[in-house]
C-alpha cells in the first residue's frame, strides 16, 4: 500500500513538471541550471555573433549559429519540479558530451 502512495505522489509531481520549462528560469535558479545543464539556451548571452555563458564566466565564447550552439538550442529541453526534491534535465545529449562539443 505504501508503494502506491509513493507512486501517487511521484505522478502528481510529474504532472506539475509540465508547467516549468527552464527556457527562462528565475534569476535565483540560474546558477543551479547553468552549472548542471551548461548548454541550455537560457545559460547563454549572445551579442554580435558570439555567445558567452551567463554564469560560468571562464567558459570560452561560442559562435552563434555554430553547430554546438544550434544543436543545444534546438534539441536540449530541460525541465524541473519547482517545489519538490526532484530536479530533472531531459536532454538529447549528456551534459559532458555537449560541453566537449563546445570546447572542441
Swiss-Prot record:
Record flagged with keyword Signal: yes
Induction: Expressed in the early phase of the viral replicative cycle.
Pfam families: v110
Signal sequence residues: 1-31
Chain segments annotated as transmembrane: none
Highest taxon in the source lineage: Viruses
Keywords attached to this entry: Early protein, Signal
Function summary: Plays a role in virus cell tropism, and may be required for efficient virus replication in macrophages.
Family named by the database record: Belongs to the asfivirus MGF 110 family.
Protein's recorded name: Protein MGF 110-2L
Organism per entry: African swine fever virus (isolate Warthog/Namibia/Wart80/1980)
